[in-house]
Amino acid sequence: MRVVFVLAVLIAQIGIAAAQTLECRAPQQRMLAIDLLFGRGPGGLTVNEQAWTQFLAREITPRFPDGLTVLDGSGQWRNPQGGGVLRERSKVVMIVVPEDPPVQERINDIANAYKRRFKQQSVGIVIRAACASF
């Protein structure tokens, strides 16, 4: 899963670079759209709703207090050790924020906290340039 993490970081850097050339029309402005993909079971501890809600309140909301969206998902990935496809429930957190260099550090802190707390191999991270308004 280290390859997935490295790929996510590269995508994030490309997304931040792409945001520098994106032109938005008023009232929208250049922003970063971030998706965090959290597995909730296989390969790590099962993450029930109570544990998820606590993690959201303690780790994610304080880092992005202006707002975010949480969706339930169903994910799958190939286990590099066993080669089989594993399916698991997941949570997708969508965050839209102004371009801000420290955003990557906040995202990495969230991913590392989740992996540590729930013994997960990885957290998917997608960062892309977007035009947004609220």
Residue ranges of predicted features:
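Mature extracytoplasmic domains of secretory-pathway proteins
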Residues: 53-90, 95-102
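Extracytoplasmic/secreted cell-surface and envelope-processing proteins
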Residues: 45, 79-80, 103, 134
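Sterically constrained small-residue positions within well-ordered secondary structures
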Residues: 10, 27, 84-86
